[in-house]
């Protein structure tokens, strides 16, 4: 995919940061020495970590040069590096791995999450938040439009870019076997957006990227027009024109006990 657009992502900065704050509130660590923000994006989650743990050595990691540039602008005193979470082997072992809205882009959760948990220092935490919205109309309709002509051939792989979120029992079993106690929950946020175009603008910064990046400008415009029309059928507006977008997210905090 093309590089992430930090400005597009930050159009909804407050809404995207709230789940990170909710995740951090459940982390049971008073004074971790080493904290790594996995998929730090433009630094909005890193900023929360700096505020809570001002004495910690904090490192933000992301694959996107654009996101890292924005993170460095926001937090010039924090270390940021370009790195792939999928192959991460942190040394020395961190006390907190914080993964807000990143692991849904990576496959093989049955092996990935236990590997990350085992990389922690004793007593350390893996804190994860992932959008769990693949079966919401906002995402089902992306796949439906992508399967129509003239998009189907060019977008055949787009739907596979996101990983299926597993069940509570699967994550609990995988992380318990890795020597952790597990706190897991699901929250549905309801975002009031400015019409159906508001939903389009929201997902353009994240979920729509695999569907738009393979298309030229003309095809993108046609895709977005069809997608917005489909959204208008799925999300009835409020009396004042706002549209309510339910957005479920899965959270877990795994603490290494052995």
Swiss-Prot record:
Q: What is its main location?
A: cytoplasm
Indicate where this protein resides in the cell. Answer: Cytoplasm
Q: Which GO terms describe its molecular function?
A: trans-aconitate 2-methyltransferase activity
**Which InterPro entries has this protein been placed in?**
Methyltransf_25, SAM-dependent_MTases_sf, Trans-aconitate_MeTrfase, Trans_acon_MeTrfase_C
Q: Which reaction is this enzyme known to catalyze?
A: trans-aconitate + S-adenosyl-L-methionine = (E)-3-(methoxycarbonyl)pent-2-enedioate + S-adenosyl-L-homocysteine
Q: What's any one GO cellular component for it?
A: cytoplasm
Which GO BP terms apply? methylation
Q: What is its EC number?
A: 2.1.1.144
User: What keyword terms does UniProt attach to this protein?
Assistant: Cytoplasm, Methyltransferase, S-adenosyl-L-methionine, Transferase
Q: Member of which family?
A: Belongs to the methyltransferase superfamily. Tam family.
HAMAP family with a match to the protein in the record: Tran_acon_Me_trans
- Function of the protein: Catalyzes the S-adenosylmethionine monomethyl esterification of trans-aconitate.
Protein name as catalogued:
Trans-aconitate 2-methyltransferase
Native organism is Methylobacterium nodulans (strain LMG 21967 / CNCM I-2342 / ORS 2060)
